[in-house]
């Protein structure tokens, strides 16, 4: 074994302690605000490093995606199985104005619906909203027994599945094309589209647990501050009142 100096050992004076720096001393808190589509707009808080030199805190925050439970945003436990994704688009003081970035089911809710003796039917469409957002919508449904059915299973044939998928795609395409992203999200909260899809397919095969399972944002238009402020209820479409113009008076004599 060679004996020599170990360069990795740092020489230090005895009695000196290493200075402990609090990592939170260089950070600051920001409040996350949800769009006015939801009842509770206070989502929570987030941390970011303070602006220093060429690094700006607002640039770091823009584009940050947070996830919130719809039950917290609506104040009702009936929506606890839905997760809403919000994207930070603008920084105003200590407030972060967000826009809708997507929606999904919780894993436990999705797994609890999958059972034996029934058929799982899924459909998806890629559509552009009226405000130029390209989204992909996923729908899910399960077959159920017919009234007074004795047979244990309720499997659907391939022709039934294709017909149900076609109806789902037509309804979702129509609803998305005729709505903005915020309007389409507001339709998902009371589950209006789910009931429409279930009623439209009851003549093909009886269904249960019909849901819009997921909404994925694929492409967004160019950022517009006015539309974001209107989404948060801070903008106005009023252009103002018309005022009478000033007319020059012509003097008869000079």
Swiss-Prot record:
This is Small ribosomal subunit protein eS1. It is found in: Cytoplasm. Belongs to the eukaryotic ribosomal protein eS1 family. It comes from the Eukaryota. One of its GO terms (molecular function) is structural constituent of ribosome. Keywords: Acetylation, Cytoplasm, Ribonucleoprotein, Ribosomal protein. Pfam families: Ribosomal_S3Ae. GO terms for cellular component: cytosolic small ribosomal subunit.
């Amino acid at each position: 074994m060679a004996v020599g100096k170990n360069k990795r050992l740092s020489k230090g004076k005895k009695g000196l302690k290493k200075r402990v720096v609090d990592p939170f001393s260089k950070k600051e808190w920001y409040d996350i605000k949800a769009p006015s589509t939801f009842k509770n707009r206070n989502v929570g808080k987030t941390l970011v490093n303070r602006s220093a030199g060429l690094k700006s805190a607002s640039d770091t925050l823009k584009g940050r995606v947070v996830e919130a439970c719809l039950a917290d945003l609506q104040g009702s436990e009936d929506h606890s199985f839905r997760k809403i994704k919000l994207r930070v688009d603008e920084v105003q003081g200590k407030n972060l104005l967000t826009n809708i970035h997507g929606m999904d089911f919780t894993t436990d809710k999705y797994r609890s619906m999958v059972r034996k003796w029934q058929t799982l039917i899924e459909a998806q469409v890629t559509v552009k909203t009226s405000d130029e957002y390209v989204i992909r919508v996923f729908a899910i449904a399960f077959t159920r027994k017919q009234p007074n059915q004795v047979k244990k299973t309720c499997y659907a044939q391939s022709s039934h599945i294709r017909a149900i998928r076609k109806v789902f795609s037509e309804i979702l395409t129509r609803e998305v094309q005729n709505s903005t992203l915020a309007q389409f999200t507001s339709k998902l909260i009371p589950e209006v589209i789910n009931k429409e899809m279930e009623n439209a397919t009851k003549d093909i095969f009886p269904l249960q647990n019909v849901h819009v399972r997921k909404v994925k944002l694929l492409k967004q238009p160019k950022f517009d501050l006015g539309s974001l402020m209107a989404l948060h209820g801070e903008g106005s479409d009023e252009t103002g009142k018309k005022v009478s113009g000033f007319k020059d008076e012509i003097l008869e004599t000079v």
